[in-house]
Curated annotation (Swiss-Prot):
GO molecular function, a single term: ABC-type glycerol-3-phosphate transporter activity
Description of how the protein assembles with itself and partners: The complex is composed of two ATP-binding proteins (UgpC), two transmembrane proteins (UgpA and UgpE) and a solute-binding protein (UgpB).
SUPFAM superfamilies: MOP-like, P-loop containing nucleoside triphosphate hydrolases
UniProt: ATP binding residues: G37, P38, S39, G40, C41, G42, K43, S44
Protein name: sn-glycerol-3-phosphate import ATP-binding protein UgpC
Disulphide bonds in the chain: none
Function: Part of the ABC transporter complex UgpBAEC involved in sn-glycerol-3-phosphate (G3P) import. Responsible for energy coupling to the transport system.
Annotated keywords: ATP-binding, Cell inner membrane, Cell membrane, Membrane, Nucleotide-binding, Sugar transport, Translocase, Transport
GO biological process terms held by the UniProt record: carbohydrate transport; glycerophosphodiester transmembrane transport
Record keyword Nucleotide-binding present: yes
Source domain of life: Bacteria
Length: 361
């Protein structure tokens, strides 16, 4: 196990194209960090820099406080699990898992011991003689994980390892990775675009946007207090409703010139008398409540719950409600009705010019 540190880490491609804009971060021994963000945000580039597959333009990467910028990938004592399993088709499961150790000239008895231990952890013991073509997608990914485990690295790197799996297998493999980390306690860096993976796996998550960490925190810290409108719109499914409002000195609000029936008691003094962006989580809103008049444009049926989409001028707002609540309200597409906060959860407030969360709220 090891610590992993980034010190003002930057990456610029040819033509002076910046990709990573200066990351400072300390990852504790045994911590599971998930880097999440949209395509092109720099998360995979950051992972490849740690692995030694991309050069560092400036700054430092340290493992156990030792700079590794100039070390070859094989010298960094890391193991990487990729999106595509990268298994040798002509080798058995045992041979695939053992190959890296053979290259490093580890004694045969030690190889046998490590492979059998990893196979037991990953429930691959009965599959060691099979070829990759005889395995399911989930089994192949477990073999790729086993190949990383037998190296006994200081740091595990996971580069979107579940992206090629179907939805059911992804859930199963998330549980496998959780159990694996609880057993091994190896420092891990995990890259994904899937916020569900980030929320369920991470001790802390790093939300990346345009090469910069927008927010670093525990999953619940990020969900409950997003640092910016980007984070609010990226974390959460469906994402947070964001609406531009004018707040009077007495706490009353208007949006696009129309009054909003939201109690001034829910409006803090820091946002009164100014323009602001107000955020409301779909699951923290109610139909037929005091708040925002909208025209219902769409209703999504998801079994036990429904997503009701209503338009207010240029804003599309979503309410998540149970199927029973929706049937009791008799709402249908084309209706005009009020939606509003449930009163039990805080509203969110963001600066209109920067998108950052209002300080102290």
């Amino acid at each position: 196990m090891a610590t992993l540190s980034f010190r003002n880490l930057k990456k610029t491609y040819a033509g002076n194209v910046p990709v990573i804009h200066g990351i400072d971060m300390e990852i504790k021994d045994g911590e599971f960090i998930v880097i999440v963000g949209p395509s092109g945000c720099g998360k995979s580039t950051l992972m490849r820099m740690v692995a030694g597959l991309e050069t560092v333009t400036s700054g430092e990467i340290l493992i156990d406080d030792k700079p590794v910028n100039d070390l070859e990938p094989a010298e960094r004592d890391i193991a990487m699990v990729f999106q595509n399993y990268a298994l040798y088709p002509h080798m058995s499961v045992f041979e695939n898992m053992a190959y890296g150790l053979k290259i490093r000239k580890v004694p045969k008895a030690e190889i046998q011991k490590r492979v059998e231990e990893a196979a037991q952890i990953l429930e691959l013991g009965k599959l060691l003689d099979r070829r990759p073509r005889q395995l399911s997608g989930g089994q192949r990914q477990r073999v790729a994980m086993g190949r990383a485990i037998v190296r006994e690295p200081k740091v595990f790197l996971f580069d979107e390892p579940l992206s090629n799996l179907d939805a059911k297998l992804r859930v199963a493999m998330r549980l496998e990775i959780l159990k694996l980390h609880r057993r091994l306690h190896t420092t891990s860096l995990y890259v994904t675009h899937d916020q569900v993976e980030a929320m369920t796996l991470a001790h802390r998550m790093v939300v990346m946007y345009q090469g910069v960490p927008e927010q670093i925190g525990t999953p619940m810290e990020v969900f409950e207090k997003p640092a910016s409108t980007f984070v609010a719109g990226f974390i959460g499914s469906p994402p947070m409703n964001l609406i531009e409002v004018d707040v009077a000195g007495d706490g009353t609000m208007t949006a696009e010139g129309m009054p909003l029936q939201i109690s001034p008691l829910q409006v803090p003094s820091a946002v009164r008398g100014r323009k602001i962006i107000m955020g409301l989580r779909p699951e923290h809103m109610l139909l037929n409540a005091e708040g925002i008049p909208v025209e219902i444009e769409m209703i999504e049926t998801l079994g036990s719950e429904q997503l009701v989409h209503g338009r207010r001028g240029k804003h599309m707002l979503v309410v998540r409600c149970t199927t029973r609540q929706l049937s009791e309200s008799t709402v249908k597409v084309g209706d005009t009705m009020n939606i509003g906060p449930d009163g039990r959860h805080d509203l969110h407030w963001f600066e209109p010019d920067t998108g950052r969360r209002v300080q102290g709220l």
